[in-house]
Amino acid sequence: YQDANGNALFSSDGSGNVQTQKLNYPSFRVRLSSNQSISHDTWTKIQFNTEDWDTNTAYDNSTNYRFTVPTGLGGKYLFCYTAVIGDLNDGKRGAVRLYLNGNAVNYGRENSYSSSTGANTYSNGQLMMDLSASDYVELYAYQNNGDSQTIYSTSIFTGMRIGS
């Protein structure tokens, strides 16, 4: 069956089994298997190494720690992310931002400031992007506490295709 513009909505395999279009594929959700240390005053890639799911094997959780758009699946994507940066001093900043093809994306960046010494900051955000096959997306974190700090394993990164 098709919509008014001829786009397939669902079909039958001829044996009575309905097959829907996988509009929200690929999708993934990744997290850290343990805490990660990040340096002071440096944007550092978060090395999400545990996959809760990865529908198209498009997230590399062992080498580059990034999502790559599979061939033929360019389109609109939604990414959601949270980084829990620990033990910052009062007024210090924790932040996250996406990188596209190795370059910082300057919109969708989330800054959080510690309200008391020793507090965790929760930097999170969502961003829709128009991507092409072979584009890749990574999540980076930043903190300015004066020494290395911890990104906790409760941090997550998710993404899914939401349309062509």
PLM segments and residue spans:
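Mid-length scaffold segments of soluble, non-membrane domains
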Residues: 76-78
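Solvent-exposed, conformationally flexible loop/turn segments
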Residues: 35-46, 51, 56, 115-120
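A detector of low-complexity, intrinsically disordered, Ser/Thr/Gly/Pro/Ala-rich segments
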Residues: 18, 40, 53-55, 148, ...
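Extended rod-forming repeat segments used as scaffolds/tethers
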Residues: 10, 20, 46-49, 54-61, ...
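Glycine-rich, low-complexity segments
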Residues: 1-2, 7-46, 161-164
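Terminal beta-strand-rich extracellular "head" domains
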Residues: 57-64, 70-71, 80-135, 140-156, ...
